[in-house]
Design a protein with these regions (language model features):
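Short, exposed beta-strand "edge-strand" segments with a Pro/Gly-rich flavor and a Y/T-containing core
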Residues: 3-8, 36, 86-91
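Alpha-helical structural motif
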Residues: 6-13, 48, 76, 96
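DG-centered beta-turn motif at the end of beta-strands
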Residues: 28-41, 85
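Short, local alpha-helical segments
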Residues: 33-34, 45, 58-62
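Extracytoplasmic/secreted cell-surface and envelope-processing proteins
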Residues: 41-44, 98
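Charged helix-capping and loop-helix junction motifs
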Residues: 44-50
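Von Willebrand factor type A / integrin I
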Residues: 50-108
Length: 108
């Protein structure tokens, strides 16, 4: 398989998820997204993300960018955020540990 240094295309990722795996997303599913939410000015397909959020138990987004950068430039995070159960800044292992603790606490 050929790999390249292409741009992030969240819209295509959500389209692929819908076509290939939508049937397995249900009220028992936790969807975890790892990424900065930058669309490179493509269509972020927040409509599909919303559909997954309506089907899933929870939508967790682990974002390496801090809050100050969300919504700047090509960031589509403001379009996804209303459908996220949790949005966490994760740039270090310590951040990841905190985010996992938050997720586990939410499942109580």
């Amino acid at each position: 398989r050929e790999m390249g240094m292409g741009s992030t295309d969240y819209g295509q990722a959500w389209s692929d998820l819908k076509v290939n795996h939508e049937s397995i997303i249900d009220r028992r599913t936790t969807v975890i997204v790892l990424g900065d939410g930058r669309s490179n000015y493509g269509d972020p397909r927040a409509d599909l993300f919303r559909e997954f959020a309506q089907r899933a138990k929870s939508m967790i987004w682990l974002n390496p960018e801090g809050r100050a950068l969300r919504g700047t430039g090509d960031s589509a995070i403001p379009r996804y955020l209303p459908f996220c159960t949790q949005m966490s800044h994760v740039a270090t292992l310590k951040d990841l540990e905190r985010a996992v603790d938050e997720v586990l606490a939410a499942y109580g």
